[in-house]
Amino acid sequence: MLHIENYIRPRNHWNTISHGEDINRLNLLLSKFGLKVDDVIDAPTFTTYISNLDVDTKIKSVLRLEDNFGIAVKDNNVRIYLDGDKLCIEKRGADNEVAICDLYKGLSDSKLNLMIGIDNKGKKIICNLAKAPHILVAGMTGSGKSVFLHSCILSLLIAHPRDCEIYGIDPKGNEFLQYAPLNNFNFVKDTVYAIQTLKHLVDEMEMRYSTLALARCRDIDEYNKTHSMKRIVCIIDELADLMYTGGKQVEEYIVRLAQKARACGIHLIIATQSPRADVLTGLIKCNIPTRMALTVTNNTESRIILDQKGADKLNGKGDMLFLPVGRTKPIRIQGCYMSDTERQNIIGVALARQDPNFA
């Protein structure tokens, strides 16, 4: 575990917004159904107004007023949803930054944790990739998709500077280049070589299963109690480029890894700014249930990445909907942001800690 306290910015004081006018306007609408604003929750960039529902409340009639609620709180992208017996009206709030200093203490050298962000209730969200065990990510230019991928890489570098091998597949060649000097980072730019890398990971997976069988171990966690096997995380910055080149072959490799690689410690984080059906195919989606949706261009793309609407109404800059495995409703989160200086500082600390003979 890297000690990065001296290399990251301290937390800034978070601003809040005034709620009085919003509450008055919302109460005028809610009073028609015998409801009112009962609570307000401020998160870094969201404000949620909560109304306690009665058993006889006409829920469908209330939900139809989404546009009216948007006018009331002066936010065209207002989000209305149910949380148990509560009606939640969520709008853009104060413009506060979620930084590494807010989240990095949730990392652990015993878990494959990723810094995600802070949700709309103010809770810090950390994802254990070992349980995910793979993630699909979608977001248009300016959504914060690349920042999210950097956050994943830095999470792994901070918690596992030596015992996690990372493959960064970056067809455009400019997103992951700064990590290339790291001994445990395999920078892959060429699309053809990227497809070969996926095949290599499939072969590595099969070899690892043979190793586990010989040791009579069920999975990598059991094996590592008496032996040593590094975890591998493959991060693909743009799946569309690979699908256009490799098509069915790429899909086959990804599906095989998604189906089997978890137990032997290989994990995928696959991103695209083109969440179309020919990129995120049905086979890929059904084998990778954990999803991260940043802002997408339309309702159709939202349904492809999340199987539901909503991602087309996000605000960009790290505003995201996170759908962990096992959940049917996504969590709205403001993602973790790190400056270029912080990123370079952490890379420098990781380089200093690495064994020169790391392989």
What are these regions (language model features)?
Residues 1-13, 25-64, 68-72, 79-90, ...:
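P-loop NTPase catalytic phosphate-binding loop
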Residues 349-359:
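C-terminal regions of RecA-like/P-loop NTPase motor modules
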Residues 220-221, 359:
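Conserved C-terminal helix/linker of AAA+ ATPases
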Residues 15-18:
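Accessory nucleic-acid engagement/destabilization modules that flank
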